[in-house]
Design a protein with these regions (language model features):
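Function-determining sites in protein domains
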Residues: 4-7, 20-130
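Repetitive helical segments and hydrophobic/amphipathic motifs
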Residues: 11-12
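C-terminal motif of bacterial Sec signal peptides marking the signal peptidase cleavage site
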Residues: 15-19
C-alpha cells in the first residue's frame, strides 16, 4: 500500500511540475528585411512613416534580438494602458507589433505569436528620443 501511495504521490508531483513549467514564446516572426517598404510608428494619435533603409535595418535587427518570454499574447492589442503600434509594410501585406513599458521593462508584443523583452535603446529609437 505504501508503495502504491508513493508512486501516486510521485506521479502527481511529476504532472504538477510538467503543468507548471512555462514555455517561452515562439521566435518573433518578421518579414524579410529586403521586402519591407516602410515602417509606420504610431504613438497616441501621431503616426510617423519611415522608409530609410538604414533605419529599417536597425529597427528589424533590434526586434530580432528581443528575448522571448513565457508571457502569452492572446489579444489583438496589449492589455496595457499605453503602447506604441508598429506596422511593418511590405508589398500587399502588413505586420503589426506593439511596444510598451511595464514594470520598468520594455516589451514587444506580436499578437498571438508572443511577447518579447527588448531594451530602452530600441524604445528610444522608435519614439525618436535618442
Amino acid at each position: 500500500m505504501k508503495k502504491i501511495l508513493s508512486f501516486l504521490i510521485a506521479g502527481i508531483m511529476a504532472c504538477s511540475a510538467a503543468g507548471c513549467s512555462q514555455k517561452n514564446a515562439n521566435p518573433i516572426s518578421l518579414p524579410e528585411e529586403s521586402t519591407i517598404q516602410s515602417i509606420d510608428i504610431t504613438v497616441g494619435e501621431k503616426t510617423e512613416k519611415y522608409s530609410d533603409c538604414e533605419w529599417i535595418s536597425q529597427c528589424i535587427s533590434s526586434m530580432n534580438n528581443a528575448q522571448a518570454t513565457a508571457k502569452e499574447s492572446v489579444q489583438d492589442i496589449p492589455q496595457v494602458d499605453e503602447y506604441i503600434k508598429i506596422d511593418i509594410n511590405t508589398e500587399g501585406a502588413k505586420s503589426t507589433l506593439f511596444v510598451y513599458l511595464e514594470k520598468n521593462d520594455y516589451y514587444i508584443e506580436q499578437p498571438y505569436q508572443g511577447i518579447y523583452k527588448t531594451d530602452s535603446a530600441f524604445y528610444q529609437t522608435i519614439t525618436g528620443n535618442h
